[in-house]
Amino acid sequence: MQSSAERIVVKQAGMKRRAGKHNHTRNRQQAAPAETGTIVKDWGGRLAVALTMPNSYYVGMSSLALQLLYRTFNAESDVLCERIFWEKGAAQAGKPLLSLENDMAAADFDVWAFTISWEMDYFNVVELLRQAGIPPLAAERAASRQWDGRPWPLLIAGGPGVTMNPEPVAPFFDAILIGEGEEAVPHFIDLCRDGLEDPAVLLAELDRTPGWYVPHLRPSNRTHPHFRKVERLWVRSLPDFDTSSTLYTPDTEFANMHLMEIARGCGRGCRCCAARISLTAC
């Protein structure tokens, strides 16, 4: 635990790119000290959000989406957001699944948010849940409690890997965001401030909110009499959002580099590619 006062650690950025081969295999304890821009907050009285790209630290920290979400959640004074990454072989070795910033167990968070970019990471989602001791299926979590009587974390997902087709992972998540999340996250935080005591009420409200797919409340079968289409979210004005690096680390594909999004999507329109569905200048 940190001191009662909020501690925000922003190290002086060393912007020189590290020479030589990047380290793909650093574990959580090795990677954290090398970071610049880490945000560490006291846990007292805050909404605790775990943020995960279900892949290695090296891959996850190469993602601007993860960095944008990290900054957006932590921008709220009554919210803390800490990162959790998948580590090859960690589950099989019986290692506990802990957050990077405060070494907190995944099950201790109020919300566990996943940003998923690739279909192959679906398998890592299930492995992470099992490693954390959390029932993988949403129905199992709804029907049970943790050993101390607390509810399980609310599990949500977003990203292109689920926007294209959420159904492969629908049984594992309480709610899935379809589309772009910049404008959806602040509203989600507002709902969590008032609704975490009763997850059923919170999920019902999300089900009525554009962009959110709550699998157990919305049949996926188009022939079902209660089928309702999910409205996909698009950011109305990308320049309103600073999609650039928040964290710097030598242990990523773009070692200690500042990244900026200058456009989103692709205008070529190849039918086999999901990137064709959006082209927006930043």
Ranges and model annotations:
Residues 1-44, 93-98:
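Short N-terminal or domain-adjacent regulatory/targeting segments
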Residues 50-59, 80-89, 110-122, 136, ...:
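Core AdoMet radical
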Residues 61-69:
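Conserved alpha-helical elements of sugar-nucleotide-dependent glycosyltransferases
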Residues 240-282:
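Radical SAM [4Fe-4S] cluster-binding motif and immediate context
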